[in-house]
Amino acid sequence: MIRVGLLGGSFNPAHGGHRRISLFAREALGLDEVWWLVSPGNPLKPKAGMAPLAARLASARKTARRAPIRVTAIERELGTKYTIDTLRGLTRRYPKCRFVWLMGSDNLAQFHRWKEWRNIARAMPIAVIARPGYDGAAIASPAMAWLARYRRSAASLIIRKTGSNRAEWSAPALIQLRFDPDPRSATQLRRADPDWALGFAGPAPRDGLTHRSIRPNPA
């Protein structure tokens, strides 16, 4: 079984902070690799200021270069809009992978607004990575009130071998990861360079999972 961490987001644009938390989580949780799920559109984020998917995927591929990170826009192919539907599609398509959902504490603070958020937690372990300025809201969130009973240490997220040599992680499980805060954010980068996407206007990037080209402004 391949152990995979899933980090979803707009990546508008991707930056070193994404890479750093991914590599940290990979080491802390004993993952084989991390997949960045570049969202075609986040239902909880405004469309204004959102760069084209092809540009965001290209920026993510550049940021993830030479790291055990796969960059994908597979949600577009799956036709999914919400995380729970994406996760169901991934588990069906990749039965030899065992997934853990990675997210920052800013997302935990609003996790209760996500579609079927409890079923997301039941589908796979969730690892929450501290993010400056959001820990208080995350701790006080409705989702944390429910997830707290499932809190586990990173060391407990281990592979259990069964007679069929399959690896299974139990869920729900909440793992809280702490490391030196990374102050970088996509919002700051957009403010500093509103036209950053123009730097990724070259050939259509290839999806790291499907290996198909991601064309600008797909129909």
Regions found by a protein language model. Name each.
Residues M1-A219:
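Nucleotidyltransferase catalytic core that binds NTPs
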